[in-house]
Amino acid sequence: MDATTAPHRIPPEMPQYGEANHIFEMMQNMLEQLLIHQPTDPIPFMIDHLQLDNDYVPKILVLGPPASGKTTVAMWLCKHLRSNLLSVENLIARQFSSLAAGARQHYQKFKTLPSGLLVRLVQARLREEDCVTRGWILDGIPETREQALLLQTLGIAPRHVIVLSAPDTVLIERNLGKRVDPLTGEVYHTTFDWPPQPEIQNRLLVPAGISEGETARKLLEFHRNIVRIAPSYPKILRVIPADQPCVDVFCQALTYVQTIHRSNAPFTPRVLLLGPMGSGKSLQAALLAQKYGLVNVCCGQLLKEAVADKSKYGKVILSFFEKEIAVPDSIIMKVLGRRLDQQDCVERGWVLHGFPRDLDQAHMLNSLGYKPNRVFFLNVPFDSILERLTLRRTDPVTGERYHLMYKPPPTVEIQARLLQNPKDTEEQVKLKMDLFCRTSAELEQFYQPVLPLNGDQDPYTVFEHLESGIINPLPNKVP
């Protein structure tokens, strides 16, 4: 761009396209790969990297002491994510590899591998096509800080590191009941995870090195190493308690590896708040606008402002207001579109509430390019909605608003003159709730992924959940 023509007005479609297609992250990933591999000809290298389309494949380390269940969790993650599991055992068991054959002989003799040899095995395996295209999960690797540093030196960097943790007494007791299926490699337990099939039961073997003394020695070695490995992965490491059912451990691990770490990409929030009347959308929108500078766009308020300004559309809207009938969607979109196209909405972002109310309006909003990047659904029980709305009152003298339960009038005199808005009668509230329930499921399906929130709690607690949903990236979808 020509610097002399500043300030520049960037079309809103440009940042939306960049955000939707992860342009910033793509450029960042390419730069990382250039710095790691340092190719002599970077252009063909970048083209090949883009064609691989593997920036978001799983790259996971699963670490933990003996009997913590790390192998089981790693295998389940591998099946669920359709990735590749790498462990010391399957690396040295690979056929048609002279490196693996040498490592196998060394392991059979010394029951361990030198750090350099293990890292070379990992590096060779990660270069193969299936690991490049579908990612990888390392089970129990690295074992020492030296191995972690060697992996980092080669540019082998995980996106998620899981460390399982449990008391030593629990692990020693658990290890004594450990059994292994020699055909599948699945790990079972005589007490906690015994297979129901008799054929599997009959072929289970007792693994070597599970005695109490041997387990205690391995635990001591693990504790000595993990405190030196952990600082190598400061922002991507998650400790998960392993002293709970294996399914719960797996669920926590899966939830973590589905998260996306915060990006440095520029982000302009475009927030849509959905929910029944009385769910607190207006309050939450005001709080977001106050703290983050977003433009608070209330559809109903925009229509009233258009009428007050006596604009071209305002005169048309006034005629519908006077007849007490709904304003056509096309006119609403004209007014709403003019507001969302203004520069403050483009630069600072917006929080929209009160529109859309049905699937047709959502399609119309989407077709005109007004696509939210965060959609929240405030869920509030019907009884709470009735309590919030039917007990609202207004003082006609001062204009002060009261609630008979949460903010009662201070004097009997004021209470005697309070009036109820006709829209807040129980019949009207039930009618509007019925209309909302008819369309809410379609809206929720249209705007996937929707972030559901419990709106029946303290407003500032709801606001904290809103903040978290806006600041943190949306989780990955895993089939």
Swiss-Prot record:
Annotated positions binding AMP 2: I325, A326, V327, G354, F355, P356, R357, Q361
Region (LID 1): 177-206
Adenylate kinase 1: region residues: 58-258
Region feature NMP 1, mapped onto this chain: 87-113
Reaction(s) catalysed by this chain's protein: AMP + ATP = 2 ADP; a 2'-deoxyribonucleoside 5'-diphosphate + ATP = a 2'-deoxyribonucleoside 5'-triphosphate + ADP; a ribonucleoside 5'-diphosphate + ATP = a ribonucleoside 5'-triphosphate + ADP
EC class of the enzyme, as a word: transferase
Task performed by this protein: Nucleoside monophosphate (NMP) kinase that catalyzes the reversible transfer of the terminal phosphate group between nucleoside triphosphates and monophosphates. Has highest activity toward AMP, and weaker activity toward dAMP, CMP and dCMP. Also displays broad nucleoside diphosphate kinase activity.
Family of the protein in this entry: Belongs to the adenylate kinase family.
Name recorded for this polypeptide: Adenylate kinase 8
Protein source organism: Sus scrofa
Lineage, highest ranks first: Eukaryota, Metazoa, Chordata, Craniata, Vertebrata
